[in-house]
């Protein structure tokens, strides 16, 4: 959910919240690793106005909640997300009114530039070169149990630039075991680089996580692979793959940075979904359990 922020009539940004909800519609309650495409995963909404000028769009509201199994829970969650956005908007407006828009926005840009400078300084300490991890593997795509999925990872360092290249990884699959490039893969790459070079606990200075860090890390994943699938491939079960990428980045840089890298994890996440229908309420109950 995103709420626009205006100060003195000028649009200066958004307050936004991303969160998990119990059910998003689709062909199966809660979790569906075996979904054939995005349409089997959920109802798709592209930038629609739930509220406009403070007034609820009742038709859209009805469509959203008529297409999920847990209406009561989802309605509460979405209203909480909206309230968080409104609070963020109000506080940002108050900040701008206190210090002026110019001061607040210039400070925000400087904050991002600071993070970029700090990360570039750490990247520059790594000897130039291409660091390649051994091939990583994922068990299967949740349907074709005898087909393992290849994960290739190379990290190139050149001056204060860094590129993570997944060329050679497994082709996209006909289940939910693909990874959205922008929404999941990039985040994993940013996390891997930050946790090695600017660890929040061990690094001596506080460096905020923001776009200044994100804009430095280049990521290559050829279209049509599990890390950059074509529309409308399903992407619900994307977790183990992104963890494997993080492990591979750490492994690739371990020789150059032995004191800043750790042993990897199992690149596994156990995600169980339980559900049933309550006749007395006329709604599903859904319980999700996540263990890493």
Label each PLM-derived region with a short phrase.
Residues 1-292:
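Glycine/proline-enriched, intrinsically flexible loops and inter-domain linkers
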